[in-house]
Amino acid sequence: MWKDDAVFKTMQQHPHYHPFVVIYPYDIYKNYDKSEIQQTLERTKRFIEGKGYEYIIPYDSERHQWVDLKSIIKPDVVFFTSPYKDSYPMYYIYHYRDTFTCYVPYGYSALELSSLNYDLIFHNLVGLHFVPNEMHKQISIRTARNKGINTVVTGHPATEVFLRKDYIPQNQWKPQSKPKKRVIFAPHHTINDPDYPSLFLDICDEVLEIAEQFKDEVQFVFKPHQVLKFKLIQQWGKEKTEAYYQKWDEMENTQLVSDGYVDLFLTSDALIHDCGSFTTEYLFVGKPVIYLCRKGIDMTKRFNEFGIHSFECHYKGSNVTEIKRFLQEVVLEGKDPMQPKREQFFEDYLKPKDGILPSQKILKVLEEVING
């Protein structure tokens, strides 16, 4: 998922930088469907082209193989979007020991995954690790072997668009015969994870039935995590997975959206999800949100200290009855007792105290480091 839009645009406007997006395959070692990986690459390419950004695909079409980026350009600065060894070794941080490296995390780290988010070899090697707030920096200091010496608090650039008063979101919603409430259903990919057990496999068909039941008053966007489809193909097979996704795209009041979410968030009325990063990001728009979690599981033990604050701003749902209640009472009837808590959370944790946007802070820090 592309989260560095604001940084890229800020660099484009800066005389010292000429940014490129590098597009290459990920999750290549997880036995995912190869055709789906290729389709993901093509969607990514179209997405970046649609933004008008310069990009590089380090692929030799004559030899049919991926090649070293350094054989095409010699980058002075590399921003990584993932800390994991999920692609070819020539795209790992080890290959850029002679290049200044930076990292903007995928999203607001809300889950209790401290070692994974702050103490991989990657986190200890990267030149600058930009984090959203002081809580995340303290987790890095406590967790990382380098004591978080490369960690800098800037806010998260992926969310600064929500702070801009001049941004006009595009309407991506399917036209309806009359105005309806707009609800996003965004399931995560942890369908078989014992530590973060998803409800998706239990309720996936019933959520479609809910969409049918509320069709006169609500329209839905199915916005799954991009990895969910890979895992469903492994579990269900390609035919059943494609049929399920197609069902979401063909009903009168439903649609499938695979790319981007900013405009969806800004034009929606509510979110149903179980995604770690969305736990905080949706709170920027101030709309009601319900988190899907299994009954009997203490989710507060699965969030870090910051994530607990985010999670406490959510309604909770463990079955379709509670989802329906959320839709009827909160979304349709406007009974929203969590609204004051969400507003206070925004003031306390999300609103920049100095008024400076994260991308501007990131470039300021980068300039200071480069110029000594």
Describe these PLM feature segments.
Residues 234-280:
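Donor nucleotide-activated moiety binding/catalytic core segment of transferases
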Residues 147, 277-350:
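Catalytic binding pocket for nucleotide-activated donors in carbohydrate/polymer assembly enzymes
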Residues 4-15, 157-243, 317-319, 332, ...:
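Conserved catalytic-core segment of nucleotide-activated headgroup transferases in glycan assembly
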Residues 22-26, 81-83, 105-107, 156, ...:
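Short loop/turn segments at strand-loop or loop-helix junctions that form parts
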Residues 354-372:
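C-terminal alpha-helical cap of glycosyltransferases
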Residues 54-62, 253-258, 311-326:
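Short acidic-hydrophobic, aromatic-tinged amphipathic segments that line or gate anion-handling sites
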Residues 69-71, 121-122, 176, 263-264, ...:
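Structural alpha-helical scaffold elements that stabilize or flank donor/cofactor-binding regions
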Residues 1-163:
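Active-site and donor-binding regions of nucleotide-sugar-utilizing enzymes
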